[in-house]
């Protein structure tokens, strides 16, 4: 039996109450960590945790992409019960989003980030993790409810991603031209 099958069996054996507890507990841990490691602008690196925080940039793209793909599988397969593919991708995206947020909290705390935009991105990311977890909890529900849960998770993740993109690439991202293209046209 592969490790993926073992994980899936363990998750499938959870009661509804245990599954809700897992999602709520994991995301409350992120909330507590956000308060314990504030993004207050103080440089604390380079340290091992500072380097770990840098993985936020790497860790966020794969779960976000998978979260975007899950509703496509749902829509085109159209089963009343979630297929194994949908279950696995949904759980992977929820766990990956949680990991990306964890790395982001560490990244902001140890690398001197602060400000309103960082706070908006932080809490948007925590909300994205929570809604990705909720979408995974809805896997036992009917097609329409699962699809709505996944689309809400994508919307919240899109908001957090937009704020993060603006922090990195400037206001108006992604709906403005690349700086190089603008410079070349002048």
What are these regions (language model features)?
Residues 2-186:
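Polytopic transmembrane helical bundles with strong interfacial aromatic enrichment
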